[in-house]
Every structure is written in C-alpha cells, then in structure tokens.
Curated annotation (Swiss-Prot):
Record keywords: Activator, Cytoplasm, DNA-binding, Fatty acid metabolism, Lipid metabolism, Repressor, Transcription, Transcription regulation
DNA-binding region boundaries: 34-53
UniProt gene name: fadR
Residue ranges of coiled coil: none
A Pfam family it matches: FadR_C
Name of protein: Fatty acid metabolism regulator protein
Any single Gene Ontology cellular-component annotation: cytoplasm
GO biological process terms held by the UniProt record: fatty acid metabolic process; regulation of fatty acid metabolic process
C-alpha cells in the first residue's frame, strides 16, 4: 500500500481509510486493538486515538466506550465531507463520481434557484449583473458559477442548501476549471446566465425549473464530450492544493 502523507496522523488516517475502502477492514468488522493497530501503522497510540476520533466524526467508524471500534458502512453514515477522500481513494472512478455530483447539484439547484427568484429577486439580479463583466477564462467562469449558486442558495430561504454546496466546493472548483476550459461550455453557461437574468428582472420564478432542466440537459451533454479527456490528477486533492 503506497500512501503519500504529510505526517504520522495523516498517514494513519489514510492507512485506515484506504483499508476500509479496499475491504481489508470491511463494514461491520471490528478494528484491531489499539495497541496492535498502532504498531501495525507505526504511530503512537495517542496519535492513533486522535485519528480514530476524527474518523468516527466523519462516519467511517463507530466508537463506543468499553466496546471495540466497529467499521461503518460509510455510504450510510458519512456526509458530503468525505467526497474529497473518495476522489483521492478512487481516481479511476472519479468521472462517475463527478457524474453523480453534477446530477445531484442540478436537481438541488433547480429548487434553490426558484426559491431565490421568488424570495429575493433583487439579490438574483444583483449577482447576475456581474456576467456582463465576466472574463472569458476557465478560472473566472468556475469562480462565478460557484458564487452564483452560493448566493442564490443562501437567498432561497433555506440555508441548508448552502451547506450542501459547501460539501461540493473542493471537487466542484477543480472540475469547474476543467469544464470551463472549453469555450463552448463557457458560451453555454453565459447564455444560461443571461436567460436567468431575464427571469430575475421579471421576477418570474415560475419558469425557472424549465430553464434549469434545459440547461441541465445541455450542460450534461457538454460534460459527456469532455469527461473522457479529464486528467486523473483532478481527482487528487493534494495535487491541486
């Protein structure tokens, strides 16, 4: 097992998580005793305890006082905060993960875009006005797209959507820069922003779902044209930090 880590705690965390991912510590199984595991990994028991507590908070493990530490089925117990970790663990499966991520974001964004134009159309108009000064670069479009989603999610009346977006942020910023490296993708997005601005100025939230659905289909087709050429390094968090 080859693990790149910046210190003992990072190494221990990656060792345990990779062992869970590769089914060496399968869901429902009991982790080795603390002393045995610390010797196996090569870290102190104090460091190991800190790592185990952190992994338990993230949903990888279940720790109960007086009982052995049990491995969870992380798909059932973890949150969006492990997306980066999954991408690091499985770069070959990263395109599929991105497909799922974009599909989820498209479905959720249709709700908070409509809510934002209904509850705070002036905020939507204000943030959409920025498209007229938007630089035609991948970086600018990726940053603006996230800003737009974040602003409208917050003004939709349900701040939980912002927390969902925050869970996507790291992965989406990297994928977004790649996606928007395509001039055609930037033009497609710009056309969408302009149509959304028209709806916002008219305070027309009713037609937002149809617009979102059309853009979701078209941007999905664009993504399928780009995904196979996506560098695998995009999946790796540390390679992009």
């Amino acid at each position: 097992m080859i693990i790149n880590a910046k210190g003992p705690a990072s190494f221990a965390e990656k060792y345990i998580v990779r062992s869970i991912w590769e089914n060496k510590f399968p869901p429902g199984s009991i982790l080795p005793a603390e002393r045995e595991l610390s010797e196996l990994i090569g870290v102190t028991r104090t460091t190991l305890r800190e790592v185990l507590q952190r992994l338990a908070r993230d949903g990888w493990l279940k720790i109960q006082h007086g009982k052995p530490t049990r491995v969870n089925n992380f798909w059932e117990t973890s949150g969006l905060n492990i997306l980066e970790t999954i991408a690091d663990l499985n770069p070959e499966g990263f395109p599929v993960l991105v497909d799922q991520l974009l599909s989820a974001r498209t479905n959720v964004s249709a709700i908070y875009f409509r809510g934002a134009l209904r509850n705070s159309p002036d905020t939507a108009v204000e943030v959409l006005a920025q498209i007229h000064q938007l630089e035609d670069t991948a970086e600018s479009f990726a940053e603006y797209d996230y800003l737009l989603h974040h602003t409208l999610a917050f003004s939709s009346g349900n701040p939980l959507y912002v927390l969902i977006l925050n869970g996507f942020k790291g992965l989406y910023s990297r994928v977004g820069r790649y996606y928007f490296s395509s001039p055609e993708a930037r033009q497609l997005a710009l056309n969408f922003y302009k149509e959304l601005e028209v709806l916002a100025k008219a305070k027309n939230y009713v037609d937002v779902p149809a617009l979102m659905r059309t853009y979701g289909i078209n941007s999905g087709k664009m993504w399928l044209q780009l995904r196979d050429d996506m560098p695998t390094s995009i999946a790796l968090q540390e390679a992009n930090s």
